[in-house]
Amino acid sequence: MQRSAEQHIFVTGACGAGKSTLAKALSHQVQLPLHRLDDDPDFRQMLPEEPWLHRVTDPQLYARWQALRRQMVQEAVRLPQPHIIEGTHILTAPELTTGHRRILVDTPLHQIIRQWLARDRAKYAEDPLRYSARDAGVPGSAVARQRAVCARQIYESLRPELDAFRSLPGVEMVPRRAFTTWLSHQGSERGSGSGLAS
């Protein structure tokens, strides 16, 4: 797909699907700055409350969460020059992506869970005190099973938004296993990029 000079490129998908990996490589490939919605300080501050799990039990918290996610996308759309904009928050405001390039990282749930557990183990190994809540234990342990349940809950909470985004016109579906091949077909209008290493 050709990119016009004014278009942002939105990269979204489930948590742990590979959005950040693809967005970073694509940013390098097409020479556009990367804007990660997860870096927003207000978003980071809400994370410990796990608002995505409280759609029914705390609707006010969930509504604040959704409003914040939508606001972050609105602000990103107004960036003065084209960017690669990456995050699950894009799923809350798909209409704001109209006229821009849309990419959905399409990764099977079992692969997302495996990735999430690996990421939790790496964070915990890096700093056990800071990341004690992310201890994923050893594979097959009760702790690992509990973290896998959490990953599944987050995925299931995003499923309606993922399905709605997937059905939008012009959405490019990029399977995680195909990143390298897909990136090799992305042209660079501002210079040459190397893509993602195999």
Regions found by a protein language model. Give the residues of each.
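Phosphate-binding P-loop
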Residues: 1-6
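Hydrophobic anchor at the beta1->P-loop junction of P-loop NTPases
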Residues: 11
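Conserved glycine(s) of the Walker
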Residues: 18
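Hydrophobic positions on the alpha1 helix immediately C-terminal to the Walker A/P-loop
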Residues: 22
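Conserved substrate/cofactor phosphate-moiety recognition/catalytic segment
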Residues: 28-69
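Glycine-rich phosphate-binding loop used to anchor ATP phosphates in small-molecule kinases
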Residues: 61-109
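Small-molecule kinase domains that catalyze NTP-dependent phosphoryl transfer to phosphate-bearing small molecules
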Residues: 122-186
